Amino acid sequence: MVGKAVTTPAVLREVLLKYLAHHPDASDTLDGIRGWWLPDMQPPPSAEALHATLEALEAEGKLIHTVMVDGSVLYARAR
């Protein structure tokens, strides 16, 4: 029996950084990132795994986040 593929934090990080390299002005919410930045990732990352990876990239200075008036959070490449 073939095991189910696992989206590791390292793979998720690599995919996000590649997306931002090709779309340097991109910004989106966690749900938007899951739907638009990672549409072909199978299995799709959990919201928790994606949030942890986004926080790690922010801690590394690769991403920033902005809290909008409605409370939603946008993530974007750090400049």
Regions found by a protein language model. Give the residues of each.
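Short alpha-helical segments that sit at the start of domains
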Residues: 1-27
